[in-house]
């Protein structure tokens, strides 16, 4: 199949125009595509999401810290919702997930462990690439 000079020139021009546009998107090595979705304030190096959760400049605390009020002893009110066993210093939720004699939570049996390699079976569900990257890394593309 032969191409006319006009087709070759048009193809070359479209590549020359597309290449700089692609480079304009690329920022720096190892930046995930999600970094483009959450824009960064270049002056302060903060993500725009930092403005959504405003920061108290005097104390350096997020406004969300006021929503979960703190006790005089430095404990969040949420600590009262999950009561603490004073004798053992454990949250009551520790009783909901019962523990085995070997100090393993029952949830460890739900996600069985490969004894030889010490890996959870879930590691087989997300297969790994030869370079040690999870296949999910390809779903969220990384800007090399």
UniProtKB/Swiss-Prot annotation:
Coiled-coil intervals: none
Known pathway: Mycotoxin biosynthesis
Post-translational modification: PhomA' is processed by several endopeptidases including kexin proteases as well as the cluster-specific S41 family peptidase phomP1' and the peptidase phomG' to produce 5 identical copies of the hexapeptide Tyr-Val-Ile-Pro-Ile-Asp and 3 identical copies of Tyr-Val-Ile-Pro-Phe-Asp, that are further modified into phomapsins A and P, respectively. The timing and order of proteolysis of the phomA' precursor and PTMs are still unknown. Two tyrosinase-like enzyme phomQ1' and PhomQ2, catalyze the chlorination and hydroxylation of Tyr, respectively.
Propeptide residue range(s): 19-35, 42-50, 57-65, 72-79, 86-94, 101-108, 115-123, 130-137, 144
Keywords tagged on the record: Repeat, Signal, Virulence
Domain of life: Eukaryota
Membrane-spanning ranges: none
Signal peptide positions on this chain: 1-18
Known role: Ribosomally synthesized cyclic peptide phomopsin precursor; part of the gene cluster that mediates the biosynthesis of the phomopsins, a group of hexapeptide mycotoxins which infects lupins and causes lupinosis disease in livestock. The phomA' translated product contains a 5-fold repeated peptide embedding the hexapeptide Tyr-Val-Ile-Pro-Ile-Asp and a 3-fold repeated peptide embedding the hexapeptide Tyr-Val-Ile-Pro-Phe-Asp, that is converted into phomapsin A and phomapsin P, respectively.
Record's protein name: Ribosomally synthesized cyclic peptide phomopsin precursor phomA'
Organism: Diaporthe leptostromiformis (Lupinosis disease fungus)
Gene: phomA'
């Amino acid at each position: 199949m032969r191409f006319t000079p006009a087709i070759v020139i048009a193809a070359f021009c479209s590549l020359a125009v597309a290449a700089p546009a692609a480079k304009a998107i690329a920022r720096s090595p190892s930046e995930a595509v999600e970094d483009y979705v959450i824009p960064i304030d270049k002056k302060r190096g903060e993500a725009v999401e930092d403005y959504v959760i405003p920061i108290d400049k005097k104390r350096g605390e997020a406004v969300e810290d006021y929503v979960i009020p703190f006790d005089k002893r430095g404990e969040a009110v949420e600590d009262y919702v999950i009561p603490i066993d004073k004798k053992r210093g454990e949250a009551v939720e520790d009783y909901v997930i019962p523990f085995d004699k070997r100090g393993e939570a029952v949830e460890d049996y739900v996600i069985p462990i490969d004894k030889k390699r010490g890996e959870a079976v879930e590691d087989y569900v997300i297969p790994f690439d030869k370079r040690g990257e999870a296949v999910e890394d390809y779903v969220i593309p990384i800007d090399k």
